[in-house]
Amino acid sequence: MSEATYQRKGRTLVGIVVSDKNDKTIVVRVETLVKHPLLKKYVRRRKKFTAHDPMNECGIGDKVKIIEFRPLSRNKRWHLESILEKAV
């Protein structure tokens, strides 16, 4: 299990893997806190990103870091950078 590191410019996001059913592809749910303009309270926003997992090493529930990458398919524009925490 060798870790490939990609030092590229672009955004990095941290999220939880919610699906790993496709080959070499994971779906990562990223949560952000955004201040509501009218209510002035923080609201949790969730968004799903499809990322490339070249060695199929992620499982559901893993906390991962993904990095912006060139388009690999219609929806895949992110690449797995590292696994921060494995699920139990």
From Swiss-Prot:
PROSITE patterns: RIBOSOMAL_S17 (PS00056). The keyword rRNA-binding applies. SUPFAM superfamilies: Nucleic acid-binding proteins (SSF50249). One of its GO terms (cellular component) is cytosolic small ribosomal subunit. It holds the Pfam family Ribosomal_S17. The keyword Chloroplast does not apply. Keywords: Ribonucleoprotein, Ribosomal protein, RNA-binding, rRNA-binding. One of its GO terms (molecular function) is structural constituent of ribosome. GO terms for biological process: translation. NCBIfam families: PRK05610.1 (NF004123), uS17_bact (TIGR03635). Belongs to the universal ribosomal protein uS17 family. Part of the 30S ribosomal subunit. One of the primary rRNA binding proteins, it binds specifically to the 5'-end of 16S ribosomal RNA. This is Small ribosomal subunit protein uS17.
